[in-house]
Amino acid sequence: MAAESAIIPQLAESITPSSPAATCSGPMAGGDTSSNAHTSIPCQQDIVLDEQTKRELFTDTFCKVCNAVLQFESHRISHYEGKKHAQKVRLYFLKNELEEMALKTQRTDRVEFHVDGEVAQGKHKFCGLCNMVFSSPVVAQTHYVGKVHAKKMRQLAGEQVEWTPQTDQDFAAAAATSPVDSQTEIADSPAVEPTCDRRCEQEGSAEQQSCPDYEIDLNDPNKYCKLCCASFNKALVAQQHYSGKKHARNQARKKMMEEMEGTGVADSEVSDGRYVCPICNITLTSIEMYQSHMQGNKHQIKESMVANLMKTSKKNYDSFQDELADYIKVQKARGLVPKTQFRQEKDQYDSCDYEEEEEQEPEPGLLHGHINSKTNAPYKYLDRHPVPYPAHNPSHPTDQRVPPWAAHWEQASRPPKGHHLDLHKAKHISRSPTSQDSSDNSSGSSSDESSGSYKKDKRRKRKHHRESRLRGSGRIRRGDENSEKRKRKGEDADSGKEDNKHDRGKTSGGDKDKHRREKKKKEEQSKKHKKLKKEGEQRTEEEMLWDESILGF
């Protein structure tokens, strides 16, 4: 601090009127001697520094005026005693003094000019805060509501205050009385009238109350637009507004809302800001986007496709295939995947079984054993013995899914008892061809053999399905007979005891005959299955490989 106390007096002595650095006519920092400072800058004759300012600006390690770091004592002494430091200190204080003077002159000029303009023109012609002149009250209103006026208010008052022409008058009166404290008085002065801001544009009647000198007829389209909430002072301005983009956009939005109400769009969707296009299955967030989508090429194409298809879909179709084709076209036009499979796999499997029943029966010549020896057509593909179906196990229940017409069909088309045995014998004979036939078939191609075995397997499957259905229908018929017998027994119980004994003897004899018949049938079936097993064991390796690869067993 001793060094500082030694330096500061020298600095104060250097900043005196006699020193060349303190005179206004001396050279400045750039060395320009042609310009003199006293022509434009008032020079202070003496600079007096108090102790607090010295401590803030000049320290032992740093000079805030020059932004210089002082590490050593010799460096500090040479810096504070130098000419550059004295010149920068002088410029620093001159700059602060000029800024204060500029603020004072700006305040006084603004107040004087504001008072003169207010007296001469009026509140709708001039804004004293922004120094702006207006050509009409509408322009003045837009300025008072605008951003420039609000920014000026925030700069002066330090907070957001609504600015009106009445507050302009209060500001002018306060500035005339005390120009120095005008800023604080403006901040504390309340607004006398409500402002003409954007809320008065949305509410039609509020605008007349806010501006009593400029009343607007809301029913006159040349004075006010109800759709855009905008007011006009001339018919030309109204015409320009009606032909502008803003009015056209609002008009299109209103029209679109009316159309959406007519089509039955939910109010919740519109209130949430979601607009759905049912044809394209797209959700939009604004009505402008919805309007552009509805007018787009993609939507128009889809709409025309759906309309044409819906017109054609009202006709009566000749077949289900035509109706299904039109349904698929409509779904594809809407961008959806059509559902073409309406049945389950079980139904398809059952339909295949019913179709197999309708296939052609074997020729009657083969059933009775009449085979043409000249033409070897029946033995063309019988050189191999295909795999038969597994033996029927009577302990397992059979498939009871038999249509109601099966019993009547069986009674009408069932062959006699000996007919089934003749069919089995004929097929057994067909499976054992002569040596001549086997030699002819061995010379055939391998493709014919494979196709012949495949056809035989198909026939055998069909036969097995028919037999299983016949068995099921036979059981149903037996159940019906048993129920009839029970009814007869109940009727006989009401009659006399002698009649009951006689009837019971008859029924017991009939039951014994039925049991015998059932036993014979079971023995015959067991013999058939044994024969089929023996024939199945005679398969070759080629047939086994074919069955594994094609049939899966």
UniProtKB/Swiss-Prot annotation:
A molecular function GO annotation: zinc ion binding
Subcellular location: Nucleus
Domain of life: Eukaryota
Zinc fingers (Matrin-type), renumbered ranges: 61-91, 125-155, 223-253, 275-305
Biased composition annotated in UniProt, kind: Acidic residues: 350-362
Basic residues compositional bias, start-end: 456-476
GO cellular component, one term: nucleus
Biased amino acid composition, Low complexity: 431-453
Stored Gene3D superfamilies: Classic Zinc Finger
InterPro entries xrefs: Matrin/U1-like-C_Znf_C2H2 (IPR003604), Znf_C2H2_sf (IPR036236), Znf_C2H2_type (IPR013087)
Primary location recorded for the protein, binned into one broad class: nucleus
Comp. bias intervals (Basic and acidic residues): 477-513
Chain residue ranges for the region called Disordered: 16-36, 341-402, 428-553
Keywords from the UniProt entry: DNA-binding, Metal-binding, Nucleus, Repeat, Zinc, Zinc-finger
Protein name per its UniProtKB record: Zinc finger matrin-type protein 1
Record lineage: Eukaryota, Metazoa, Chordata, Craniata, Vertebrata
